[in-house]
């Protein structure tokens, strides 16, 4: 298993290279998932935990007071200030031409500011080319795509043949598709792919919620191939102190990563 540093030097995607460099520099494989509906609160929490994360995962369409100038521009400033990247968890799932417009147009203009986004494989490989075209037409900055191979929710249909087919779609573009949302390693190294595995549903304290979320521990997911742990309510839910929890998850994630090499 290659180190983050080695992967930052060898990866085919500039987005992945930068992400691995940040992870190595900050000693963090923590992605903060902030499902927060008010801009001020979103930015405030992000500013406090920014030093401890490599990535923030947003759901920009739940921000009720969203404006491009008031939400996106300060978000980008915080990413610059604290040296983390931005992942908009849009989960595109339509035909190529439609997702192309969803990605670059509308009120959110995701392709302009999100380093990384993600998509379901359900509509086939056209989704990858549609999103890539949108990125190329929108910005000169590099963009990366994650495919949703597996989900952490109870009763998810994303497993088995569906997961295998999604992996095949990912192989259609080595530079733009940088990895997967998945629960374990997706292989591919023998064919020259170096996929980043990001795993949601990671918690040190909770086992799940009433809406079907199932949590796994940091050690458990990193041991099975996760590169980046995605933590949401574990950082700020139930009256938790975001700074204290961000430090805790950063340390747990980094220690689990170092244990890979023992």
From Swiss-Prot:
Pfam families registered for this protein in UniProt: OMPdecase
Catalytic activity: orotidine 5'-phosphate + H(+) = UMP + CO2
Active site: 91
The UniProt record lists the keyword Disulfide bond: no
Coiled coil: none
GO biological process: 'de novo' pyrimidine nucleobase biosynthetic process; 'de novo' UMP biosynthetic process
UniProt keyword terms in alphabetical order: Decarboxylase, Lyase, Pyrimidine biosynthesis
UniProt: substrate binding residues: 35, 57-59, 89-98, 215, 233
Pathway: Pyrimidine metabolism; UMP biosynthesis via de novo pathway; UMP from orotate: step 2/2
Molecular function as annotated in GO: orotidine-5'-phosphate decarboxylase activity
Enzyme Commission number, as recorded: 4.1.1.23
Enzyme class: lyase
GO cellular component, one term: cytosol
PANTHER family: OROTIDINE 5'-PHOSPHATE DECARBOXYLASE
Family as reported in the entry's similarity comment: Belongs to the OMP decarboxylase family.
Name by which UniProt lists this protein: Orotidine 5'-phosphate decarboxylase
Organism name: Pichia kudriavzevii (Yeast)
